[in-house]
Curated annotation (Swiss-Prot):
Superkingdom: Bacteria
Name of the encoding gene: argH
Organism classification: Bacteria, Pseudomonadati, Pseudomonadota, Betaproteobacteria, Neisseriales
Enzyme class: lyase
Entry protein name: Argininosuccinate lyase
SUPFAM superfamilies: L-aspartase-like
Organism name: Neisseria meningitidis serogroup C / serotype 2a (strain ATCC 700532 / DSM 15464 / FAM18)
Similarity-based family: Belongs to the lyase 1 family. Argininosuccinate lyase subfamily.
Length: 458
């Protein structure tokens, strides 16, 4: 038997260099279990349409069960001479059961076979990812609930802007991850379309019934155009784009954790098990996990660009270029799953330092907007109030104190609308409580959102 299933057409064997260059078994063998799933469903359909008999189907099932056990136990020997996971499994099956193994590929091409395998694999990865996103959301909700009344500076341009609740800040990431989860679910709808039956590119002359295979494999839809079915990698790009957004969100949170852990901020501490030391500086405690997440986000974004570039100039239908879709896709899923898993654990190891957060609020005139709103509510036009408060801030800055520390007579020098009730809005806590509306940072709203999200995730 030839090593290649297609070698009868050629007058000379493929060179060893070409074998090494074109073989994909080194990475696509991770699709083996899904390849077997697809083959078993295909065999069942061929039997129901009269292409295979009951004996062939029984032999195929028995042989595939043995191969699956060999794969799971690590006993199977993969051969680069057979190029890919599909040919390796088919050869092993034929060695075990003879002619029935040769009949399995009837009405099928590796083109629709690999497209099916990838979709089956990716569908399962998305299920895992969605569960891990929800686990991370739960960890963030725990932090938010514990810190509904913990005041911290909210920033714009990385400058102190207004007081916010630390719980409210954590909820912002819960919202981002909620959108990420929605995108993954939406992406899965398009992943869950079956290309099997498209064969090489034009369909097959055998009396196949694709509906049978789709039902057996749990596909909700069937790809309706054979050319598109074998050449489509939109679903891979879409998944990588969704994964990139998750990583971008985690990279943003990582940047904040890194800053907040710095002694210059001192807002939080991260448990020792997520940090490392220095080989030369004994005092160092480095936030390696969030730093790596920040770095790995670029890796995933790079895979997105790579996949888009891979597809941009391909004519219909299948081209060998598409062999290059798997490694970035595999690495994207692996990186995202590992990141989500470690991140949820890490967030449970975050210790909040409320006193340091409140002290930072007091250093940045964070309640200046509250003073302007106070004046507006007493009848002053907002633009005039803005100017009055700006003058008060300049005075407080020169005096080295916070607005709340200015004597009443000094504040009244800027506007006679100011009375002794002003100090109720100048404290960080007063600022938080004043924003008690849907989506606001008031502790009551934080608790409402935590409850809402817990119900959604239940």
């Amino acid at each position: 038997m030839h090593d290649k299933t297609w070698s009868g057409r050629f007058n000379e064997p493929v060179s060893e260099l070409v074998k090494q260059y074109t073989a994909s078994i080194g990475f696509d063998r991770r699709l083996a279990e899904w390849d077997i799933q697809g083959s078993l469903a295909h065999a069942q359909m061929l039997k129901e349409t009269g292409v295979l008999d009951e004996g062939d189907l029984a032999d195929i099932r028995r042989g595939m069960a043995e191969i699956l056990e060999e794969i799971r136990s690590g006993k199977i020997e993969w051969s680069s001479d057979l190029e890919d996971v599909h040919m390796n499994i088919e050869r092993r099956l034929t060695d075990k059961i003879g002619d029935a193994g040769k009949r399995l590929h009837t009405g099928r091409s590796r083109n629709d076979q690999v497209a099916t395998d990838i979709r089956l694999w990716l569908r399962d990865q998305i299920t895992v990812i969605r569960s891990l996103i929800q686990s991370l959301q739960t960890a963030l909700l725990d932090l938010a609930e514990q810190n509904a009344e913990t005041v911290m500076p909210g920033f714009t341009h990385l400058q102190v802007a207004q007081p916010v609740s630390f719980g409210h800040h954590m909820l912002a990431y819960v919202e981002m991850l909620g959108r990420d989860n929605e995108r993954m679910a939406d992406c899965r709808c398009r992943v869950n379309r079956m290309p099997l039956g498209a064969a090489a590119l034009a369909g097959t002359t055998y009396p196949i019934q694709r509906e049978i295979t789709a039902e057996l494999l749990g596909f909700e839809q069937i790809c309706q155009n054979s050319l598109d079915a074998v050449s489509d990698r939109d679903f891979a790009i879409e998944f990588t784009a969704a994964a990139s957004l998750v990583m971008v969100h985690l990279s943003r949170l990582s940047e904040e954790l890194i800053l907040w852990m710095s002694p210059r901020f001192g807002f939080i501490d991260i448990a020792d098990r997520f940090c490392t030391g220095s080989s030369i500086m004994p005092q160092k405690k480095n936030p390696d996990v969030p730093e790596l997440v920040r770095g790995k986000s670029g890796r995933v974004i790079g895979h997105l660009i790579g996949l888009i570039t891979l597809m941009k100039s391909q004519p219909l239908a299948y081209n060998k270029d598409n062999q290059e879709d798997k490694e970035p896709l595999f690495d994207t899923a692996d990186t995202l799953i590992d990141t989500l898993r470690i991140y949820a654990d890490m967030m449970r190891g975050v210790t909040v330092k409320p006193d340091n957060m409140r002290a930072a609020v007091m250093q940045g005139f964070a309640t200046a907007t509250d003073l302007a709103d106070y004046l507006v509510k007493k009848g002053m036009p907002f633009r005039d109030a803005h100017e009055v408060v700006a003058q008060a801030v300049r005075h407080a800055d020169e005096a080295g104190v916070d607005l709340s520390e200015l004597p009443l007579e000094v504040l009244q020098g800027f506007s006679d609308l100011i009375a002794d009730d002003v100090y109720g809005v100048l404290t960080p806590e007063g600022s938080l409580n004043a924003r008690n509306h849907l989506g606001g940072t008031a502790p009551e709203q934080v608790r409402f959102q935590v409850k809402r999200w817990r119900e959604m995730l239940a």
